[in-house]
């Protein structure tokens, strides 16, 4: 039994509140246990200069935490005048993951801005951001479809992410909270599509190593969790699912 009473292959409670914000084309509040992230999707009728004239769109992301998302207040990065390496890595990861399942040609010469703002952090903020951002993005695409700006919702598959790790007492566990993540021997983030294809795997031994057999066990646990997360996405999207499947 884990610190919060879950089984080793059990996700935290997941809830996705759609249309959480008034102004964006798509928005959600995703809750994964005590981690809460607001994800919004904004559509601009232009692309970055390097994409002009190619007839394709672009998806990019920004990520941030409010100061008291964590136990101790952190200084806003805007106050520091620069984005940290961690933040840059996460927002590139989010954009890269989403682009893997978007049909950029169907999107046309538009940019989708994904903004992920962590309002409470208890581990897994980047994976929750990806899972929530996918839903926000599809909601924005559905508005483009309603406005007849696209011929179909420009996504090729579902996309979700979770964390897995190895704890000394429990072995391989799914969806680590902060207390577990801070003492894990191995920590891994996994992004997968609905068809079971990997988009990205980030795994690190924390003063420890892991075997090929453990790697397979980690990936199996991640897939188990991601398939459940995709079902949560489908529930949140409702009738829009018929335009994806």
Swiss-Prot record:
Catalytic activity reported: tRNA(n+1) + phosphate = tRNA(n) + a ribonucleoside 5'-diphosphate
CDD domains: RNase_PH_bact
GO biological process, one term: rRNA processing
Binding site for phosphate: 86, 124-126
GO molecular function: 3'-5'-RNA exonuclease activity; tRNA binding; tRNA nucleotidyltransferase activity
SUPFAM superfamilies associated with the record: Ribonuclease PH domain 2-like, Ribosomal protein S5 domain 2-like
EC number: 2.7.7.56
Pfam families associated with the record: RNase_PH, RNase_PH_C
Transmembrane domains' residue ranges: none
Domain of life (superkingdom): Bacteria
UniProt cross-references to Gene3D superfamilies, sorted A to Z: GHMP Kinase, N-terminal domain
Entry keywords, A to Z: Nucleotidyltransferase, RNA-binding, rRNA processing, Transferase, tRNA processing, tRNA-binding
InterPro entries tied to this protein: ExoRNase_PH_dom1 (IPR001247), ExoRNase_PH_dom2 (IPR015847), ExoRNase_PH_dom2_sf (IPR036345), PNPase/RNase_PH_dom_sf (IPR027408), Ribosomal_Su5_D2-typ_SF (IPR020568), RNase_PH (IPR050080), RNase_PH_bac-type (IPR002381), RNase_PH_CS (IPR018336)
Ligase among keywords: no
Biological role stated in the UniProt entry: Phosphorolytic 3'-5' exoribonuclease that plays an important role in tRNA 3'-end maturation. Removes nucleotide residues following the 3'-CCA terminus of tRNAs; can also add nucleotides to the ends of RNA molecules by using nucleoside diphosphates as substrates, but this may not be physiologically important. Probably plays a role in initiation of 16S rRNA degradation (leading to ribosome degradation) during starvation.
Quaternary structure annotation from Swiss-Prot or TrEMBL: Homohexameric ring arranged as a trimer of dimers.
Family: Belongs to the RNase PH family.
PANTHER family: EXOSOME COMPLEX COMPONENT (PTHR11953), EXOSOME COMPLEX COMPONENT RRP41 (PTHR11953:SF0)
Record's protein name: Ribonuclease PH
């Amino acid at each position: 039994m884990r610190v919060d009473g879950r089984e080793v292959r059990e996700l935290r409670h997941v809830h996705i509140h759609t249309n959480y914000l008034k102004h964006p084309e798509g928005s959600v509040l995703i809750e994964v246990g005590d981690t809460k992230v607001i994800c919004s999707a904004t559509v601009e009728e232009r692309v970055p200069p390097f994409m002009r004239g190619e007839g394709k769109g672009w998806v990019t992301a920004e990520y941030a935490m409010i100061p008291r998302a964590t136990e101790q207040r952190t200084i806003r990065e805007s106050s520091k005048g620069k984005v940290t390496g961690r933040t840059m890595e996460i927002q590139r990861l989010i954009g890269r993951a989403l682009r893997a399942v978007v049909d950029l040609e169907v999107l046309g010469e538009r940019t989708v801005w994904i903004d992920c703002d962590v309002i409470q952090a208890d581990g897994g903020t980047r994976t929750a951001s990806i899972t929530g951002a996918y839903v926000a993005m599809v909601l924005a695409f559905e508005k483009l479809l309603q406005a007849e700006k696209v011929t179909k919702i420009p996504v090729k598959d579902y996309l979700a992410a979770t964390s897995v790790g190895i704890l000394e007492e429990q072995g391989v566990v799914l969806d680590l909270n902060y207390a577990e993540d801070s003492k894990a021997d191995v920590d891994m983030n996994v992004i997968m599509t609905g068809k079971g294809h990997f988009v990205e795997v980030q795994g690190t031994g924390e003063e420890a190593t892991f075997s090929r057999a453990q790697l397979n066990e980690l990936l199996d646990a991640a897939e188990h969790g991601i398939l459940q997360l995709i079902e949560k996405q489908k529930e949140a999207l409702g009738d829009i699912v018929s335009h994806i499947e």
